[in-house]
């Protein structure tokens, strides 16, 4: 039986109505830096990038070194690179993993993160044969939770003292967990 990574190799690109999910390249660095250097965007995701070189290094480290299950989000209408979505932490035995995403704030509140998330969820359950997907967000970032809910994921629980905040020294993060099983997905389809 093929493992998830072999199956993922066949899905380097995914199309939705408005989006083209595709591999991230070094040429995407300026567009990624546009949002990766914005503290409003990175507040609940990753350390803010301080130079284009840092963004290029991150692309090489995270997207070029391990490209499977990682997509750049590009607008079909104009080819603009606006964010990323990842299928991470794959458990090959249990066939489960997690979804993470980040979007340039100029494209927030347009349903684009939800559209990309729904596409990755469909791929995970319909093509890859996964059993369960998990997504988490900082309690102080409810907009991310709305993306998860609109994508069909179900609230699971809150995890107090989950980690230290990357941006606010001393603040302990409560993470909110959302889950979707294959059975739940198929029942709602």
Regions found by a protein language model. Give the residues of each.
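Acyl-donor (CoA/ACP) binding surface of acyl/acetyltransferases
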Residues: 1-39, 43, 70, 74-189
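Conserved GNAT-fold acetyl-CoA-binding loop/helix
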Residues: 40-61
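Juxtamembrane/interface motifs at transmembrane-helix termini
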Residues: 51-54, 63-65, 76, 102-104
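A short helix-loop-beta-strand connector motif used in the catalytic cores of GNAT acetyltransferases and
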Residues: 60-72
């Amino acid at each position: 039986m093929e493992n998830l990574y072999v199956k993922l190799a066949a899905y380097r690109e995914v199309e939705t109505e408005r989006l083209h999910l595709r591999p991230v390249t070094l040429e995407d660095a300026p567009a990624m830096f546009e949002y990766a250097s914005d503290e409003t965007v990175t507040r609940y995701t990753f350390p803010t990038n301080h130079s284009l070189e840092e963004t290029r290094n991150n692309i090489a480290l995270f997207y070029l070194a391990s490209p499977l299950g990682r997509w750049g989000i590009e607008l079909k209408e104009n080819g603009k690179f606006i964010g990323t979505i990842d299928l991470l932490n794959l458990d090959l035995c249990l066939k489960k993993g997690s979804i993470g995403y980040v979007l340039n704030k100029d494209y927030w509140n347009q349903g684009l993160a939800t559209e990309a998330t729904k596409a990755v969820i469909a791929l995970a359950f319909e093509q890859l044969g996964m059993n369960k997907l998990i997504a988490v967000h900082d309690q102080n970032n409810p907009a991310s939770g709305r993306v998860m809910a609109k994508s069909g994921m179900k609230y699971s629980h809150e995890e107090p003292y989950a980690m230290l905040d990357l941006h606010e020294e001393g603040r302990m993060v409560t993470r909110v967990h959302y889950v979707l099983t294959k059975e739940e997905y198929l029942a709602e389809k």
